[in-house]
Amino acid sequence: MPRPVVRALTGVLALTAAAAVLPLTSPLPAAADSIVVGGQPAPVADSPWAVALSSRDRFGGARAGQFCGGVAVAPTKILTVAHCLGEEALGGPVSRVRDLRVIAGRDRLSDTTGQEIPVRGVWVNPAYDPATNAGDLAVLTLSRALPQSSVIPMARAGDAAYRAGTAADVYGWGDTTGSGTYAPVLRSARVQVLPDSECARAYPGGREGTYDASGMLCAGDPAGGRDACQGDSGGPLVARGRLIGLVSWGSGCGRVGSPGVYTRVSAAVQWAEGRI
């Protein structure tokens, strides 16, 4: 079965990700993830927990080396997705990326505001399955702490924020059109959490991917046009002030009937028990 398209970009992948079913990362020498389609600028002062993953060595300096997103859930802990740290995205093992950093407190990637904090520890969910994107989770440990005010609470199992119909916002620096136009500043798009039954109909298996409600949730705009996209992978989906999802995969960007699929944070908390 062809692998669902993640929202991270890589060399050749960066040219075709908008039309394929792949994980969401960003363009340039290696591979990276997607951006927010149909959104608007989102001042980082209002969303200080939204961070960018960076490696200038692997992705060049034009966008500060940004290739994926992440979210601060503790002063030294960043949640992102496993496919952002895979060899396909990075062009080699993550252990060989000597300049892996988290960019925090920066709206425009070309600016020098905020902080670029080296990553001192990487944990990738050992149960992650690249063929299905199940278990798409990684935890980064920072070499120095962010302020507590830059941390977002995580929605646990049973939280009302997961209810179908709930308004949510997805954040990223990824593709804003689905055709390779990357955002220079952090953006967000308003979507809604969709029923698991609708997600399962959209992704029943086969070429379009398989939706698994135990570790995934999906969200989108029923009319299409608003979604995460390439370069947004690992970025936050936030509802009622709490983190409910991480950008993971989808079919295209903003298509009617093809909602974005996210790692379910209540499941991530269990997978990463003791590491957050």
Q: Residue spans of the language-model regions?
A:
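Conserved, non-catalytic sequence blocks in retroelement Pol enzymes and Pol-derived host proteins
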Residues: 39-44, 128-130, 208-210
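Active-site region of chymotrypsin-like
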Residues: 47-66, 145-153, 187, 195-233, ...
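Solvent-exposed loop/turn segments at secondary-structure junctions
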Residues: 78, 84-86, 108-109, 129-131, ...
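Conserved H-D interstitial segment of serine endopeptidase catalytic domains
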Residues: 53-56, 81, 86-127, 204
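Protease-domain processing segments flanking chymotrypsin-fold serine proteases, especially trypsin-like
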Residues: 2-79, 87-95, 101, 215
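Chymotrypsin/trypsin-fold serine protease catalytic domain
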Residues: 117-118, 133-137, 143-222, 265-267
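C-terminal subregion of chymotrypsin/trypsin-like serine protease catalytic domains
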Residues: 5, 51, 72-86, 98-101, ...
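Short glycine/serine/proline-enriched coil/turn segments at secondary-structure junctions
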Residues: 60-62, 110-111, 129-132, 161-162, ...
